[in-house]
Amino acid sequence: MNAAPSRPDSSRGAPKSPLREHVAQSVRRYLRDLDGSDADDVYEIVLREMEIPLFVEVLNHCEGNQSRAAAMLGIHRATLRKKLKEYGLT
C-alpha cells in the first residue's frame, strides 16, 4: 500500500501536518463553544466525531470493501465491523 509520507513531530519545531492542525482548530472551536459549560467526556466526543467520517471516507475510497478498509486503517476487520455497528454505519 502507498501510505502518505510521515511528517516530523511538531514538538521538535517542524511544521504541523495539515490534518493535525485541522483537528486542533476543531477541538479549540469546540472547547470555546462550550462557553464555560462542563464537559467530562470530551475524549469520547472527539473520538466519535473523528472516527465516523474517517470510516465513511475510507469505506467510500475502498468501494465498501471492509477488508480493504480495515487494512488501510491498520485495524482488524472485526474491529472495523464492531465500530461500524456501534456508530450505526452498517
Curated annotation (Swiss-Prot):
One of its GO terms (molecular function) is sequence-specific DNA binding. The keyword DNA-binding applies. InterPro entries: Fis_DNA-bd (IPR005412), Homeodomain-like_sf (IPR009057), HTH_Fis (IPR002197), Trans_regulatory_Fis (IPR050207). It comes from the Bacteria. Residues 1-22 are annotated as: Disordered. Keywords: DNA-binding. Pfam families: HTH_8. The keyword DNA-binding applies. Residues 66-85 bind DNA. GO terms for biological process: regulation of DNA-templated transcription. Belongs to the transcriptional regulatory Fis family. NCBIfam families: PRK00430.1. This is Putative Fis-like DNA-binding protein. The lineage of its organism: Bacteria, Pseudomonadati, Pseudomonadota, Gammaproteobacteria, Lysobacterales.
